[in-house]
Amino acid sequence: MKFCPMCGMSQFKSGLSSCEFCDYEEKPIEKLSKQEIYDLMAPYEYEWVEGGARILGVKNNRDLALRGSVAIPHFVTEIAEDALSHCKFLARIELPKNLRSIGDRAFAHCRDLFDVFIPESVSHIGKGAFADCYDLGVICAAAPSQPDGWDSEWLLDCSARVEWSSIDE
């Protein structure tokens, strides 16, 4: 099960490209209108990078912007250092299947975060990416083992265990 990036409803089933609740339809970034891009990126500060977008941070109040279950838009390829840290009411995060990089402390201090699936496309995770995520008991990763590009201390100050070769449901 995955979450719709527009409405956050969990009924956005894997393998489908549209949401039955809000009529969102997943399209390649080249086919999105400026308004569709704005709507998807509304809570985030971002910049365009080769092949997609990098989330730099959260606009306004982190506690109001990211709460409960959140799906990162499908055209985001990088999450910058400290970008989503201190979002204390963030519980679940769905990372896009083409995400390449998670920066240092990107999700640090997200104390309610309990559900993360890391897609196999992620070739870099920085130091302390999930530091002080106290509710995070298990991190599911699609990779069969820790990729070379992941910092040896990516789980610094995080007691979660990693389930390798996991499948996103």
For the regions a protein language model found, what residue spans apply to each?
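Residues immediately within or flanking Cys/His clusters that coordinate Zn2+
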Residues: 1-2, 16
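A structural signal for leucine-rich repeat
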Residues: 131, 152-155
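Structural signature of tandem-repeat unit edges
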Residues: 32-53, 62-78, 88-101, 111-124, ...
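Short functional micro-motifs and their immediate structural scaffolds
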Residues: 12-13, 27
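Short cysteine-rich clusters marking metal-coordination/redox-active sites
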Residues: 4-7, 19-22
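Short Cys/His-rich micro-motifs in 6-15 aa windows
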Residues: 22-31
